[in-house]
Amino acid sequence: SGPVKLPEGTIRFSMTRRCLDPILRNNAASLYALERDVRLIEFHSKANALTDESMEVVRAAAEDHGRGIVVHNDAQHFSAGVDLNGFLSLIRAKDWGGIDAFLVRFESSVKALRDAPVPVIAAPSGLTLGGGFEIVMHADKVIAHANTVMGLVETSVGVVPGGGGVKETFARWHRATGDWRKAAWNTWMQVGYGQTGTSPELSARYQYFLPERDQSVMNRDKLLSLALAEVDRMNDAGYAPASAYEFERPGGDLQEEMAAFMDKGIADGLFFPHDKTVAMAVAGIVTEASPVGVAATEDELFERERRAFVALAKTPETEARIASLLENGTVLRN
């Protein structure tokens, strides 16, 4: 039958990889140097669940960045998020410091990626959810396969995005609307509901895919060559990393409105008590319980995400949700 021949302009990384030695490799991920001194981060754990080892490779790429970084893999799903088995073990051991430390490392990894002095291109396909999507959100540009499903789904297991997902969604909605109150409400709603876009075009309604910046591609085998070309294009144009976003967390009656929305949902039988606990934890990241809004830095929002995550991890309801998903494959409503 001979070797598989792919059309011009198409590359399948699983074929390219056979001729390459990784710069760094562990059980979860590998870092490669491709032609023209571009780095490629490949996740390859089970279901591409993210662990500390995955993030170690992300940080290594940000340091040894060459002329650009591409985050891409050939698996059916880019990454469905952080490894929940690891979290459940930490919760059962009541190792809150361990959870906090994991989130600190995760945050520092996505920040290092975003602040790298070279272009960072994410080229996902399939499920790109939770922590997997948080990595994509910190890239300069997304070149996504048309089947990519994007979203922050953490609330379904009783936690909040803890790697900049809330922060980044909030910034994007503010860029789109120029209104912090609207940005806070939209972020709260879609993170609270764990909404996903089942294609790049549908993800655009959540600001998860930015049509004016990002690209959707029908042929999966073109993702890598397009990403490599984009690194060249950005470098030729004189690349500089984006500066940190300055935030405002709106005050007034916004938190009360959010609480009332949840209470009505519970009364109508749409929500369960723990849904409100989780929703108000998200609210606490993007709003302030004071008459006026307050300025906030990106680092403060990261810290609020992390605190909210750890506080929820301490609740028996969240432990039950994570256990239900891992042990029965069902999303527990409690």
Tell me what each language-model feature is.
Residues 1-70, 172-199, 205, 211-334:
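Intrinsically disordered, low-complexity segments enriched in small/flexible residues
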Residues 111-157, 191:
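Glycine-rich beta-to-alpha active-site loop
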Residues 123, 146, 156, 163-180:
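Active-site-adjacent scaffolding segments
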